[in-house]
Structures are given as structure tokens and as C-alpha cells.
Amino acid sequence: MLNQHKVFSAGVHGERLVHVLSGRYLATLATRNGDGSIHQAVVWFLESDGAILIATSAATRKAQNAARDPAASVLIDTRGSGELRGVAASGSIEIVRGDEARALNETVWSKYLTDQGLEDPEVGGAIRANDDITLHFCPDLPWRTWGTDSDFGGAFGRPGTSYALDA
């Protein structure tokens, strides 16, 4: 899992990075379309030894974009009542295929799906039939972090200072 020495320096930013990268959150992956515009996709992810793994289908736009141009960025944030933490990095994507991709994808799915979900033919079966590659995002270090828990002295995270985000 998280290779802390590889990804960050100690302190509040490191703690935030560990919290967000090891949590069960959604990530936004940005890749570049052929015309130069940006394509964003919300994805499940798994941090592995400083990289971000994303299970997907080779037929998706994000996969086709990564095959043509490996430059990408990832944004992961938490959104709770009175709390916002996030991390972001730019980097590049390597596409993993075959048996290695199938094994990596199982680890990504198991972060988000229960054993029951993985065994259900309409859930686990469907996702296995669809996701045939893994996007291996290698961030350019360092990650950027932010959070209402500590930025600006934590003032934005104090009760009564801001409205709660809609669920």
C-alpha cells in the first residue's frame, strides 16, 4: 500500500495525503482528447506503492486518450459537513493489460465492492466482463494537498463559518 517515503514529507500534508489516498473516495481523472480539450472521468482508484491504479475498459475515452497521450492528472477529495480535504497530482499513465491487469483490477474492485458484490453476476460479473485494462497513474511529485482542517489555521473548518455542502 502507501509508500509514505516515496509520496510525501511528514506533517499535516503527509497525514492528509495518507487519509485521502487510503480512503474509499472517488477520484477525478483528467486526460487530453485528440482535439486538445480535457476529458474528465470519475473513477474508483487504489493507491499502490505511490501510484494510482484505475480499472477500466480499453474502449473508454480515458483509456483511448491515455494510449495516445499519457499525460494526465488526478484529483481526489473528501466532502463532508464542514470538512474538505483533497490531493491532486499531474503525471503520466502506463496501460497494463492481460493477466496482470486482471489481478490489479481485482484489488481495485475489492476496495469498493463487498464479497457479495464481487460474487454477484450482475455486479462483479459485469465489471469483470467490462474492465480489461488497468491505468497505472505515476504522479510527478510532490502531491498538492489542501484541507479546511488546517489551511488558514483551520478557520474554514470551524462550525458556523461556512455552509455544509449538499449531499
Language model features by range: what are they?
Residues 1-12, 85-167:
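Charged, gly/pro-rich active-site loop segments
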Residues 2-28:
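Short, basic/aromatic recognition patches
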Residues 17, 41, 62-65, 100, ...:
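Amphipathic alpha-helical interface surfaces
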Residues 18-19, 44, 64, 125-127:
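Short secondary-structure boundary/capping segments
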Residues 21-22, 67-68, 109, 128:
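Alpha-helix boundary recognition
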Residues 24-58, 64-66, 72-77, 85-88:
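Short beta-strand segments
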Residues 35-37, 80-82, 125-129:
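A short beta-turn/loop motif at secondary-structure boundaries
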Residues 60-62, 81, 151-152:
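Short, surface-exposed beta-strand-loop junctions and turns on beta-sheet-rich folds
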